[in-house]
């Protein structure tokens, strides 16, 4: 594993470890993470690594269980739906704000993004489609101009990336998502905050419904639950 540079260790550790956890190659949902092992591999002290871990806990990517350690969060069905309920509310407000301030250049950029999404789907490039679709949503949040909403949705988007790796979602109605994006963009062109919020919320609600149908109806043990068993 590549060792980190001595300058800006805290930010480098956060960036590296976040990417490592989201990628899904090394850790599986619910796995315990050894901070000591990562410290040796990266050639840094545990202090910047713990700083990164605390930030990732705030984002909902890891769970710190007292006296037991750090675990990669396992997204059970209930947690997944909770995340999408929050996403619906926040993206609805972001769309409303974006409709009030969006420029013609930004509209053109969003249209180009949708065209890219459709091109990726046509080529069967599902991972690239997901990346472009997330860029679309992130750009709307940026246009909205709210740092608070941006920070909260940044955490949610990170968790969605992790869920996609963990659950290996199968593509089902992705062309419909592109159509939803087109409808939302149409409301931006009209500079209509109310209907933009409506379209954004409906789109996220439809995604949540599809995910709800695809998730298994089973309880997945959390690190905290496993911890109680270990303690007893």
List where the protein language model places each region.
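Short linear motifs at protein or domain termini
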Residues: 1-96, 100, 212-232
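Conserved amphipathic alpha-helical segments that form helical-bundle/coiled-coil interaction surfaces
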Residues: 79, 83, 104-165, 179-187, ...
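Alpha-helix N-cap/N′ positions at the starts of helices
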Residues: 33, 67, 90, 109-112, ...
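Juxtamembrane/interface motifs at transmembrane-helix termini
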Residues: 5, 50, 101-104, 128-131, ...
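C-terminal-biased regions
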Residues: 26-27, 31, 35, 55, ...
